């Protein structure tokens, strides 16, 4: 994993944020969606270039998992380690291993979202605010590896910081006191293009 970390650091330092975002899209297209399924047979037949029994077994387990059986060999791994595997194009990991890591990362992200939304609804019901939600989203973003941050809008961090400083009350400052907290959270979590339009307007 240390070699993957070194390769990731070199890649991140040599590319701009925009280039890194494009690289992420390119790599993800090979392990998800049509790009993955178009090469499904080859992906399932892929074997890592190693004689290490543990690594060979891990690759086999990953193929079994992405085909609906067995346990994800990367279950419980940290998000940083998962990212190293997902975006590693050196051949150290098979396509199915990278897909399995991507699935685990997706599951962890989904669990985080469920928790932060539940906490934020409680915050909204009690105070009318979403300041803690914006803070949690910002902290989550800052913890992401550079290649994952690059997939977010350029204005994401700045706008969240602005909303945190504003400490807005969505109940008392909306029509008839019925502001939709869920709508605001959905826009932030789904990276709504109008909300993060990078032109300085505040759309939350």
Residue ranges, per PLM feature:
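Type III/flagellar secretion export determinants
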Residues: 1-204
């Amino acid at each position: 994993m240390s070699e993957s970390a070194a390769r990731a650091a070199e890649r991140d330092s040599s590319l701009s944020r925009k280039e890194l975002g494009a690289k992420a899209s390119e790599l993800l297209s090979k392990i998800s969606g049509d790009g993955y399924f178009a090469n499904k047979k080859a992906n399932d037949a892929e074997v890592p270039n190693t004689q290490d029994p543990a690594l060979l077994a891990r690759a086999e387990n990953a193929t079994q998992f992405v085909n609906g059986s067995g346990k994800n060999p990367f279950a419980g791994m940290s998000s940083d380690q998962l990212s190293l595997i997902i975006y590693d194009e050196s051949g150290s990991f098979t396509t199915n291993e990278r897909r399995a890591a991507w699935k685990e990362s997706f599951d962890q992200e989904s669990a985080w979202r469920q928790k932060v939304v539940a906490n934020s609804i409680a915050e909204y019901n009690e105070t009318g605010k979403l300041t803690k939600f914006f803070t949690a989203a910002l902290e989550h973003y800052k913890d992401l590896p550079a290649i994952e941050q690059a997939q977010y809008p350029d204005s994401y961090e700045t706008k969240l910081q602005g909303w945190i400083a504003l400490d807005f009350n969505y109940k008392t400052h909306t029509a008839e006191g019925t502001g939709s907290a869920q709508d605001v959270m959905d826009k932030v979590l789904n990276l709504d293009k109008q909300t993060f339009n990078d032109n300085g307007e505040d759309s939350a």
